[in-house]
Amino acid sequence: MKKFIETLKNCWKIEDLRQRLLITLLFTAIYRFGSFVVLPGINPSMLEKLQSQTSGGLMSLLDMFSGGAFSNASIFALGIMPYISASIVMQLLAVAVPYFQKMQREGESGRKKIQWYTRVLTVAILVFQAPSYLLNLKMQAANALATGISWTVFMIPATIILAAGSMFILWLGERITDKGVGNGISLIIMIGIIARLPQAFVQEVTSRLQAISSGGLIMFIVEILILYAVVCASILLVQGTRKIPVQYAKRLVGNKQYGGARQYIPLKLFAANVMPIIFAQALMFIPLAIVRYQSENASTVVQQLMDNRSLLYNVVYVILVIAFTYFYTAITLNPTQMAEDMKRNNGFIPGVKPGKDTAEYIDTVMSRITLPGSLFIAFIAIMPALAGLLDVQQAFSQFFGGTSLLILVGVVIDSLQQIESHLLMRHYDGLLNSGHTRQGGVAAY
């Protein structure tokens, strides 16, 4: 523990890392503050019905992603999900449409163009989602407006504020990515999830203590043990890698010999990280948009897709998670490009011919590790529904797996790795190691 505290002190000694940590804390604090700023014209005391509506089902998950901003009718009520939806569409277009395929191969300039299109599409989605949210608010809490304000007058400025709030969250996320620590978008989602954890934990403890005579305390201990096991399994999933050995040919430059060393290509078991589950969850929110307009006439199928504990919801969810895992892995890792880079640098995989055979070998290995990875991630994704079989409270069950847990684990590990890289670059031990200053690559004790 002493070494860990010393390492935290080392984080503060590095000026660049200190600034990044402070910027991250500042922007996340701004995001949390905005989650409590209610839309102008709304009477917060009249939102009980909207908050009760988000206490269960898929609406509760959407509210958790926004850190409670959805049920508070805040300026950040739509959260970051419109941007996630736009990203899904652009990822699909980058695979299916030649124009975007070419753009994706243009490197940094192409990435900036795709990012611009993603922002434009985000605005288009917000033009639809903001009025949809306000119509739902009107149905659930028609008397939520302050005295003297009509819904007709309220709709247009409120739509602009909601859209601007969501775009501001996107801006915060991008600034955190550029100037802070970790992936800003994922970090903002994680902050929203963590904000709901204390309340969910208290509700679960209270519920179990009330049933202490019927074994409630024992069940709570069992829940914590299961939660611990699931967290450990999730960490192994995120960190698991398959190393492919690469041998580099020896070459003589002057009187010095270079190359000849064996290195490894670390293919992650879950190369797509948390993106497939975020994308799948974003698509599962589509039934909400349908029901907002015709809640009474919604079909049984749509109603089941809104219940994150129903069989249909979880079957569709598993299929989407597996599909997005393969899809995102395919667009993230390019075996052909990896094989070409290896050949260009006089590298080869022992026993495999350079070029096409190497690309096929890497692709085969990727397919073999992606299948178990996608199945395991799908199992983790439906763990909240399985936790419901143990009568775990709806809010607390979300932390047993699924989107919430994987985002928490993935974002924390990603942020720690970035902090670790800053420490190692400046000759300190990593965050999870001893914390002593290194000199010339050797720890100084």
Where would I find each of the regions flagged by the language model?
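N-terminal cationic and glycine-rich segments that engage phosphates or anionic surfaces
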Residues: M1-Q104, S109-Y445
